[in-house]
Design a protein with these regions (language model features):
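Acidic di-acidic motifs
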Residues: 191-193
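Short glycine/proline-enriched coil/turn segments at helix->beta-strand junctions
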Residues: 93-95, 126-130, 184
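N-terminal helical cap/lid subdomain that shapes the substrate entry/recognition surface
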Residues: 10, 17, 22, 27-120, ...
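Short, structured coil segments at secondary-structure junctions
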Residues: 42, 126, 150-153
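N-terminal acidic, proline/glycine-rich, low-complexity intrinsically disordered segments
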Residues: 1-9
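A general structural motif
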Residues: 28-31, 127, 185-187
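Glycine-rich active-site/cofactor-binding loop and its immediate structural neighborhood
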Residues: 125-127, 136-137
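Substrate-recognition "cap/lid" segment bordering the active-site pocket of phosphatases
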Residues: 131, 137-189
C-alpha cells in the first residue's frame, strides 16, 4: 500500500490519521528497534503525572536538608543544571543513597493514567524490538506501564540504576544502553518528549 508523506499507511503505528505535512514514513523502513522514554512520552504530559514526581523531589529535599520550599526548588534546579539530574547532584555533593530517593519520589498515584489499549495496539504494529529507556527506576516504569496495560509490549526497561545513575543525555549512557541490548544505533529510533 502506498501513502502520502503527510499520512501514514493504514497499518502504521498511528493508523489512518493525519500528521505533520511532509512527514515521510519511508524514512523509518530500516528501523528494527523502537526505544521509548517513559515520562511524558509513553503517557501524555497532560496527565500531570510527572508533576507528582517533581513535587516529591522538592519534598525530599525539604525534609532531607530542612529547607523551605523555595530553597529546595532552587537546589533541585541547580543540581539538575549542574549535574544533569537532581539525583546525580545529591549523590555527588551529599553522598545520597539513590535508592532511598527513587523510592520516595516515585511513590505517586498512577491511577490518574487511563488504560491505553490503542497505544498498546499501535506499539504491537511496530516491527522489531521495543525497549523503554527511562531516567526513573524500573519499579516506577513497571507501575506506569502496568497501569496503562502495555507492560507486556516491551522487551526490557533500562533505568537510571542500569545507567549507573548517569542521566541522559550523557553519551556514555547511550553507549551502555546499546551495548547491553545489542542495539545498532543506525537501525534504532528513540522517542522522547
Amino acid at each position: 500500500m502506498t501513502h502520502t508523506p503527510s499520512t501514514p499507511p493504514e497499518d502504521s503505528l498511528l493508523g489512518p490519521v493525519a500528521l505533520k505535512p511532509g512527514l515521510d514514513w519511508s524514512a523509518l523502513d530500516h528501523v528494527d528497534t523502537w526505544i521509548f522514554d517513559l515520562d511524558n512520552t509513553l503517557y501524555a504530559a497532560g496527565s500531570r503525572l510527572f508533576d507528582q514526581v517533581h513535587r516529591r523531589m522538592t519534598a525530599f529535599i525539604m525534609e532531607s536538608f530542612s529547607l523551605d520550599r523555595e530553597a529546595a526548588l532552587t537546589l533541585q534546579r541547580d543540581y539538575f543544571r549542574a549535574h544533569g539530574s537532581t539525583l546525580r547532584g545529591l549523590m555527588l555533593r551529599h553522598g545520597l543513597d539513590p535508592h532511598d530517593y527513587l523510592n520516595y519520589v516515585h511513590d505517586i498515584d498512577v491511577s490518574v493514567l487511563p488504560p491505553a489499549p490503542e497505544l498498546g495496539a499501535a506499539i504491537d504494529r511496530l516491527p522489531g524490538r521495543k525497549l523503554v529507556f527511562t531516567a526513573g527506576s524500573t519499579a516506577h516504569a513497571d507501575r506506569i506501564l502496568t497501569r496503562m496495560g502495555i507492560a507486556d509490549r516491551f522487551e526490557a526497561i533500562f533505568d537510571i540504576v542500569a545507567a549507573d545513575f548517569v542521566p541522559k543525555p550523557a553519551p556514555e549512557v547511550y553507549d551502555l544502553f546499546c551495548s547491553r541490548y545489542g542495539v545498532d544505533a543506525a537501525t534504532a529510533v528513540l522517542f522522547e518528549a
